[in-house]
């Protein structure tokens, strides 16, 4: 896919630091012109195969098992010592060097040494996860280059969506670093304005989670909480969602879980109610920063958290990505959209690149057959 990117997205923006640029620089010693053309044509055929109904194709279909899909994790997956095993790959080391040059501080040192409190701060955690995920791609490129060459789609959870856009050459790497800095700072400021929380929530078919959230929100209002909110922030898998809102609202749900037939609630280690209206103040600075970036059409399908559908073009990214800050992450819907196919049609290989194994575990609960061909490239 490196070759395809060069041909399909040429010329690149002058001065932009795209994933294909720095990744191909790390591997260009073995690249030949004939291979570029062959890989580009093959990749374009893969994309065409996926975009046309099978009965309308006039050429032999490419086996879906020969294609790949990338998934990228979000904030909360970071841990002290992350990326240590990636440093044996020159490309991964170069990614961190470039990040340090742009950020003007040693992000890798924070990943490796912490302390945990520093790494978990939103302004560091989001950058650490994104850069480590891109570094994990370098391990994949070294060990299974075909997975990169035949990749036809990508998606990322929350912050991971920005990682996916970098991977798809829609967003330059250096600009993405600055954008994530703005995003993290603005989201932390929103957290400071209203104390919020998030909780993984397991429930049964007899649970009315919407009513429970509405009751919690009304309870906050009655108690004098200003402009309270409680609602679904992440759609994970059947009978599992992340609920977020004011701290008081989640405390109400936890105390009354049995009466609402909620089976379990587990608080997430985050500083606010992400992907809810409580983050509204973060939208404007993020949108302003995004407008300064010259976006490109993704060279592969990248799915939006907002509606679970692929981005259509660069302008679509500009309008859709800011909404993600205050809208629920529709991850379950995204997985259905990505892996929906006719009976008997094989699934692509799926690679989760970044810290943790959570996205593959969720895929197992949403589509067990698709998960049989999934792999982790752990940062």
Swiss-Prot record:
Function text: Catalyzes the transfer of a malonyl moiety from malonyl-CoA to the free thiol group of the phosphopantetheine arm of the ACP protein. This suggests the existence of the biosynthesis of fatty acids in mitochondria.
Question: Transit peptide: where?
Answer: 1-23
Phenotype seen when the gene is deleted: Eggs have a thin shell.
Q: Which domain of life is it from?
A: Eukaryota
Q: What class of enzyme is it?
A: transferase
Fetch the InterPro entries from UniProt.
Ac_transferase_dom_sf, Acyl_transferase_dom, Acyl_Trfase/lysoPLipase, Malonyl_transacylase_ACP-bd, Mitochondrial_malonyltrans
State what protein this is by name: Probable malonyl-CoA-acyl carrier protein transacylase, mitochondrial
Q: Which organism is it from?
A: Drosophila melanogaster (Fruit fly)
Is the keyword Lipid biosynthesis in the record? yes
Where it sits in the cell: the answer is: Mitochondrion
